[in-house]
Structure formats: structure tokens, C-alpha cells
Amino acid sequence: MTLALPRHTSDPASAPADRDHRPDPGRGPGPAPSRPRVLSVAGTDPTGGAGIQADLKAFCAHGAYGMAVTTALVAQNTHGVRSVHVPGPAFLRAQLDAVSDDVEVDAVKIGMVADEANARAVGEWLDDLAAARAAAGAPRPWVVLDPVMVATSGHRLLDAGAEQAVRDLAARADVVTPNLPELAVLGGLESATTWDDALRQATSYATASDAVVLLKGGHLTGRTSPDALVVPAPGPTTGRAPGAATVTTFDAERVDTPHTHGTGCSLSAALAALRPQRASWEEAAREAKEWLTGALRAGAALRVGTGRGPVDHLHRSAPVRPG
């Protein structure tokens, strides 16, 4: 279902859903690679359900060539996090440069940044990469930010400086993929308790920040699990009417399963892998949502861990055989 919210009067009646919210003369049509080259910038999960391990599986599931840069080494399993080691921004930048100096990256998915210094390092790298691509007359990569800021328990994972650094990263992203608690932190609000409130918060944030938002409704209860793509109207934010955005809602049945570990990582990674292969963010988001719903249904068959298990990223290409 598509909802057309009030739009700025100078906006055409049907703005494209894949509108890039930042001017970028460097991006343009060109020969597509045989496989999109997609980079994950995130933390680790040694059990494979979340972080860069999950991202690489999601990239593979959508026909992309996956690469990974590690922001933090996380000792975790299906029951929770035990310890985190952050190598630091200098080594993070060395990893990022090692990739971009050699490989033309088509899309970047950013997940856990761990701290303010790392977030700033990623932002500076994105700026330098965009400048280098523009100087070469080449398009910059699509950027998807999964703002990992709140634990499942509701605990804030970042201090105030790091939260602001993530907000600054959001200004460099094409799409931000918050759940309800993360959206509240981004916007400085209380977490929404209804879908209507969440849509209002997402629309307010999108129009004020000029960010495209893929809002995830998995934290709500009910028979359905909606997501929504919120695209702000074109034009400067100072002249934009409040709520001037287009909202496209993707409904799906709520899968009754405890195997939800890494769902946010996996959805944002699928979105990053799909965007270079699809005509719009709406098309990519719809396909990513459908894939994740199937991955949730299939997760129990994996039998990985004794806690909150992972989804099955390969449920389409290599389904688990019964017996």
C-alpha cells in the first residue's frame, strides 16, 4: 500500500522512489558488473547469525560479491554478547582503504560502528571515496546505514558523542534502516508504541534530515509485521512542509519464531545487495522484505544454538532437507 502524504507544492506529483537525497553529479548510468561488489562495514558474530558474517550470506543470497571490513570483534552467541574488542579507527581506515584502493565498490552496508572514533573514520572514508569517484568521473557507491544503537534489552549501546556521529553518518547514507528504538534515538524522541506513531516519527525525521528511511516494525506486536519506505520530497529542507514525504508500506505476516537473531543486519545487507540490481529503492526494499520473511520461516530448521537462533539466509538457493 502506498500513502501519499502532504507534499511541498513545488514537488511533482510523483517523485521517483529512488530519489537520491544528496546532489551527486558523479552517479550515473554505466556498464554493470557481472556481480555487484558490496562491502559490509560492521562487527562480527562468531556464530554467524549477525554482523559481517550474516551480511556476507545475505549478499551471496542475492547474487552479489561480498566483502567485509571489521569495526569490532564481538564475542557473542545466540544468548547474547560476552565481550567486545574495538581495534580502533586507524586500523579501520586501513581496512577501508585496502578495499577501495583496489576494488570499485558498488554498494556499502554500514552496521555496528562501536564508538565515535570509528563512526567518524567511516564518514571521512565515505567523503574521500565520493571525491575520488567524482574526480574520476565514476559513480559513488550506494550507502545503506543500519544504525545499531540500541540492544535488544533496550540498553543504549553508544554514548552521546557516538550517537551524534551515527546521525552524521546518516547524512551520508542513501537509506537508513532503523527499528523503532533506533528511530527514537536518531530523532531524540521516545520510542513509538504504535505503527501510526512510528510512521509519524519516521516521516518527521526523513523530512527534517533529508534521509530516506526504511522503517522496521518488528518491535511491535500484532498479526502483521510492517515495514515502510519514507522518501522525503525533493528540495531544500528549509522550504519543505512538515510531513512532505511519500510513504510506501510493505506488509507481511508476523512469523511466530524465536529465531530472529540478525534480522536487522540481514535486511539492510539484502537491501544493499539488491539496489545496484534494481531500478529503485522501493523495488529493492520490497524484495528484501519478502526474502527476510522466508528466511525467518526457515530459521528453525538450521538448529544453530540454544538461544535466539539465526534466520536461514540460503532458504531459497539451498533449503534444508527434512529428515
Tell me what each language-model feature is.
Residues 159-247:
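Conserved phosphate/ATP/ADP-binding segment of small-molecule kinases
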Residues 58, 184-185, 259-281:
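Short, small-residue alpha-helix embedded
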Residues 198-206, 248-250, 280-297:
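Short, well-structured alpha-helical segments that form the helix of a local strand-helix-strand
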Residues 2-8, 12, 16, 35, ...:
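Charged C-terminal helix
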Residues 63-67, 237-248, 274-288:
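Phosphate-handling active-site elements
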Residues 41-47, 247-262:
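Short pre-catalytic strand/loop immediately N-terminal to key active-site residues, enriched for Gly-Thr
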Residues 3-12, 21-40, 56-152, 314-320:
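Conserved N-terminal subdomain of the carbohydrate kinase-like
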